[in-house]
């Protein structure tokens, strides 16, 4: 009887162990192909590949993963990988936007909007992975000492779904970036064509000038010297004519200034004479009045002096 119970117990434990340690599902062919493309693609794809590898390691739910999930280390590393991926993606998007400048504004706005939406979906997928692991860590800490088999199975199922969604959105983002890059390449080619069209007439003008210079170089030296002398003579005559015209203008300006000064001097002289006349008209009556008063005063003084010097009659006569 004891032997039978021991056999049953061993069988039960073996079954539990086999059930708990479930083998990780092998990656599907699209996942392997996508990961291979990330390993040899743009910097943002390489960063996403590192996030993908780390998520695959977490999905194994090994003992080391279980221990690190009890601490914030896994979520911190996932956050770092997320930030690195989004940073590289924004840098690549900015680079493509610079190359897309020759494209029509409407097309550029539409492509940018679609790419931004795909970028947001990818960021949301990575954020969901991190949030799910944070939730699992909280639940795992609350169940210390208890069976976590059901919790692990639920996490494994969620991680599989999140990986599939992440793969789908990453593939969609790659396709939209390819369209964006094709538009940038087309815009660059249009820009080159426009530059070529603008430079064409300039090149033709340069060719004509070179031909003209070549024909001038083929002329005899005496003819070229004579033509140069005529041009210099015409230039000197033109400068002399301009100088004479300028001198005439200066003379006219000086004459105008002199006439204005003489006119102003005459006006000042007339104003001074008028002012002098007004002063004279003001003070002449006053002077005449003072003279009359002075003459009257002198007469009164003389009369008073004459009266005081007259002889007094004597009483003896």
Curated annotation (Swiss-Prot):
It comes from the Eukaryota. The lineage of its organism: Eukaryota, Metazoa, Chordata, Craniata, Vertebrata. Residues 80-255 are annotated as: 8 X 22 AA approximate tandem repeats. APOE exists as multiple glycosylated and sialylated glycoforms within cells and in plasma. The extent of glycosylation and sialylation are tissue and context specific. Belongs to the apolipoprotein A1/A4/E family. This is Apolipoprotein E. Its main location: secreted. GO terms for molecular function: cholesterol transfer activity; heparin binding; phosphatidylcholine-sterol O-acyltransferase activator activity; phospholipid binding. Keywords: Chylomicron, Endosome, Extracellular matrix, Glycoprotein, HDL, Heparin-binding, Lipid transport, Lipid-binding, Oxidation, Phosphoprotein, Repeat, Secreted, Signal, Transport, VLDL. GO terms for cellular component: chylomicron; extracellular exosome; high-density lipoprotein particle; low-density lipoprotein particle; multivesicular body, internal vesicle; very-low-density lipoprotein particle. Residues 278-290 are annotated as: Specificity for association with VLDL. The modification Methionine sulfoxide is found at residue 143. Sequence repeats lie at residues 80-101, 102-123, 124-145, 146-167, 168-189, 190-211, 212-233, 234-255. It is found in: Secreted; Secreted, Extracellular space; Secreted, Extracellular space, Extracellular matrix; Extracellular vesicle. It comes from Theropithecus gelada. Residues 210-290 are annotated as: Lipid-binding and lipoprotein association. APOE is an apolipoprotein, a protein associating with lipid particles, that mainly functions in lipoprotein-mediated lipid transport between organs via the plasma and interstitial fluids. APOE is a core component of plasma lipoproteins and is involved in their production, conversion and clearance. Apolipoproteins are amphipathic molecules that interact both with lipids of the lipoprotein particle core and the aqueous environment of the plasma. Gene3D superfamilies: Apolipoprotein (1.20.120.20). Homotetramer. May interact with ABCA1; functionally associated with ABCA1 in the biogenesis of HDLs. May interact with APP/A4 amyloid-beta peptide; the interaction is extremely stable in vitro but its physiological significance is unclear. May interact with MAPT. May interact with MAP2. In the cerebrospinal fluid, interacts with secreted SORL1. Interacts with PMEL; this allows the loading of PMEL luminal fragment on ILVs to induce fibril nucleation. GO terms for biological process: acylglycerol homeostasis; cholesterol efflux; cholesterol metabolic process; lipoprotein metabolic process; melanosome organization; phospholipid efflux. Residues 266-317 are annotated as: Homooligomerization.
């Amino acid at each position: 009887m004891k032997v039978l119970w021991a056999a049953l117990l061993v069988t039960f434990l073996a079954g539990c162990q086999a059930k708990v340690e479930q083998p990780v599902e092998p990656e599907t062919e699209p996942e392997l192909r996508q990961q291979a493309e990330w390993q040899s693609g743009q910097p943002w794809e390489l960063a996403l590949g590192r996030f993908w590898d780390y998520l695959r390691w977490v999905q194994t739910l090994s003992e080391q993963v279980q221990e690190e999930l009890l601490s914030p280390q896994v979520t911190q590393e996932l956050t770092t990988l997320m930030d690195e991926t989004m940073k590289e993606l924004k840098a690549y998007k900015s680079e493509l936007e610079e190359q897309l400048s020759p494209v029509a504004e409407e097309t550029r706005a539409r492509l940018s909007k679609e790419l931004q939406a795909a970028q947001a979906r990818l960021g949301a997928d990575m954020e969901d992975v991190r949030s799910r692991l944070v939730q699992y860590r909280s639940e795992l800490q609350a169940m210390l000492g208890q069976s976590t088999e059901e919790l692990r199975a639920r996490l494994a199922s969620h991680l599989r779904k999140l990986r599939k969604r992440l793969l789908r959105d990453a593939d969609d983002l790659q396709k939209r970036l390819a369209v964006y890059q094709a538009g940038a390449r087309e815009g660059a080619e249009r820009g080159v064509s426009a530059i070529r069209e603008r430079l064409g007439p300039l090149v033709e003008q340069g060719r004509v000038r070179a031909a003209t210079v070549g024909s001038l170089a083929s002329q005899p030296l005496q003819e070229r010297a004579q033509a140069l002398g005529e041009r210099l003579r015409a230039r000197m005559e033109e400068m002399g004519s301009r100088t004479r015209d300028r001198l005439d203008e200066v003379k006219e300006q000086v004459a105008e200034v002199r006439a204005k000064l003489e006119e102003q001097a005459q006006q000042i002289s007339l104003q001074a004479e008028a002012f002098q006349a007004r002063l004279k008209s003001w003070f002449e009556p006053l002077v005449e009045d003072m003279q009359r008063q002075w003459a009257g005063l002198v007469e009164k003084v003389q009369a008073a002096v004459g009266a005081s010097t007259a002889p007094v009659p004597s009483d003896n006569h």
